[in-house]
Amino acid sequence: MANVYDLANELERAVRALPEYQAVLTAKSAIESDADAQVLWQDFLATQSKVQEMMQSGQMPSQEEQDEMSKLGEKIESNDLLKVYFDQQQRLSVYMSDIEKIVFAPMQDLM
């Protein structure tokens, strides 16, 4: 029987070889080479982190913060590079979700 760690490493290499994974890498590289997209990306990451911290501490964003997030979302949607990135991320997430279901199926048997 194959070593489970060897199989996990093989899966990791297979995921990295997926065209969808490569498309996300290409889209990420395009963002990194465009100053405007990079600023929007950094704003998105900072806002996402702030909202996650608020939610974890039981707080909800104020109306002003929600409006700011909405405006940022509109800017992101209007940036072609970021739009492509998020579209490619979504395609990759379908694979990752399917893989997660398969990998964690034995754990469900124990519940």
From Swiss-Prot:
Q: Where is the composition biased (Polar residues)?
A: 52-63
**Region feature Disordered, mapped onto this chain:** 52-71
NCBIfam families of this UniProt entry? PRK13676.1-1
This chain belongs to the protein called UPF0342 protein SAG1376
Against SUPFAM superfamilies, the record matches this protein to: YheA/YmcA-like
Q: Which family does it belong to?
A: Belongs to the UPF0342 family.
HAMAP family to which the protein is assigned, alphabetical = UPF0342
Give the InterPro entries listed for this entry: Com_YlbF (IPR010368), YheA/YmcA-like_dom_sf (IPR023378)
So which domain of life are we looking at? Bacteria
The protein's matches in Pfam families, at most eight in alphabetical order, are given as: Com_YlbF (PF06133)
Species name: Streptococcus agalactiae serotype V (strain ATCC BAA-611 / 2603 V/R)
